[in-house]
Amino acid sequence: MRIVALEGIDGSGVSTHSRLLHARLAGAGVKSCLWKEPTEGPVGRLIRGFLRSTEGVDSDLMALLFAADRLWGLRLGVVERCGGSPEVLVVDRYKYSSLAYQGVGSGLEWVDAVNRKAPEAEILVYIDVPTEVALRRITARERREVFETPEFLERVKSMYEEVLRLARARGVKVIRVEGVRGGVERGIEDVQGEIAERVFEALGLARA
């Protein structure tokens, strides 16, 4: 199973582009499955409750919960939902989100350690958008989550740079895609076209 993880700060379009990439892969005849974190499993439901809370969230606790939810997904959830092991698993956030988000409060080294049982992705697509753009998109939503504040997202964005360096050092193919170019937001089709082309190439597949 080849893991393709899509990452970025909240408001960067990770969920949208995960769904579209999966559709392109499936349309090309690839046995692809779309997976989202937090999952719909028992631990994932607990995490979602914390994320919607107006109270503070303990970073260490969240790191452990996300790690447990991730292993549940990899060992049980994916097989059940995907009808076996897919050729390509497109993940709407993976352990790199934990390293970036919980790494801010708990330290990158410790969060990395509790996620060692989760294999590295083959490809990590990082959708890079300025924090102010992400916040504008978040503000347009009906509901915000506990992590979606300007100060915190700035720290997460900085932490992602460390996470990307770590992933590269471990042999992960990192694909950085700009969501904004020349000060102008790129359209969804434009961004997705670049993501699909570069992912297909990295996987050794015919052009999307």
Curated annotation (Swiss-Prot):
Cellular component GO terms held in the UniProt record: cytoplasm
Keyword Nucleotide-binding carried by entry: yes
Cross-referenced InterPro entries: P-loop_NTPase (IPR027417), Thymidylate_kin-like_dom (IPR039430), Thymidylate_kin_CS (IPR018095), Thymidylate_kinase (IPR018094)
PROSITE patterns xref list: THYMIDYLATE_KINASE
Stretch list, region Defective ATP-binding: 8-15
Any GO BP: dUDP biosynthetic process
Gene Ontology molecular function terms on file: ATP binding; dTMP kinase activity
Disulfide bridge positions per record: none
Reactions catalysed: dTMP + ATP = dTDP + ADP
EC number: 2.7.4.9
One Pfam assignment: Thymidylate_kin
Keywords assigned by UniProt, alphabetized: ATP-binding, Kinase, Nucleotide biosynthesis, Nucleotide-binding, Transferase
NCBIfam families documented for this protein: DTMP_kinase
Family to which this protein belongs: Belongs to the thymidylate kinase family.
PANTHER family with a match to the protein in the record: THYMIDYLATE KINASE, UMP-CMP KINASE 2, MITOCHONDRIAL
Name the record gives this protein: Putative thymidylate kinase
Gene that encodes the chain: tmk
